[in-house]
Amino acid sequence: MTKSTELRQKDVAGLKTEVKELQKAHFGLRMQKATQQLTNTSTLRSTRRSIARAKTILAETIVKQGAKK
């Protein structure tokens, strides 16, 4: 899980790749849960929240860049 301060230091491309990586990880966790291989189901929730956090910071970054132009 990455912290908000670490995410805010990344540029737009870095944030987009972070979101994609988190979504892939979340998909893998969902498949593990479906096949009953996942023992710690709280990782699903934390991954989902990390995705939301990264998307929020991505949107904020895009708005800031638009305001600077």
Swiss-Prot record:
InterPro entries recorded: Ribosomal_protein_uL29 (IPR050063), Ribosomal_uL29 (IPR001854), Ribosomal_uL29_CS (IPR018254), Ribosomal_uL29_sf (IPR036049)
GO biological process: one example: translation
SUPFAM superfamilies noted in UniProt: Ribosomal protein L29 (L29p)
Keyword vocabulary terms for this entry: Ribonucleoprotein, Ribosomal protein
Keyword Nucleotide-binding attached: no
Recorded GO MF terms: structural constituent of ribosome
GO cellular component: a single term: cytosolic large ribosomal subunit
Alphabetized CDD domains for the sequence: Ribosomal_L29_HIP
Ribonucleoprotein in keyword set: yes
Domain of life of the source: Bacteria
NCBIfam families associated with the record: L29
Similarity remark: Belongs to the universal ribosomal protein uL29 family.
PANTHER family associated with the record: 60S RIBOSOMAL PROTEIN L35/50S RIBOSOMAL PROTEIN L29, LARGE RIBOSOMAL SUBUNIT PROTEIN UL29C
Protein name: Large ribosomal subunit protein uL29
